[in-house]
Amino acid sequence: MSTNVQDISVIIPLYNEEESLPELVSWIEKVMQQHHYSYEIIMIDDGSKDDSWKVIASLAEKNPQVRGFKFKRNYGKSAALHKGFEAANGKVVITMDADLQDSPDEIP
């Protein structure tokens, strides 16, 4: 577990969201860089049946701010959020849905 304190932790519980993840991470990165925030993006794959975990692993490999956790089965949003809060190192913690319904532009 990283002990580096970030300005913001963004926790994203998800289930079968492989298509939206690259766009979401890119959008969050853009907002954080515009406002000069240090940040981490914590994605919790809640037992997805699609390739969400492969996408998370690929994003984490390219970006040290991205971390992922994978549940073997679907435990529900509350359990995924709980895991995210346990892992978060941010002074401020924000939760977002992975389906692009929440705009990262609202973070600041």
Language model segments and positions:
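Structured catalytic core of nucleotide-sugar glycosyltransferases
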Residues: 1-108
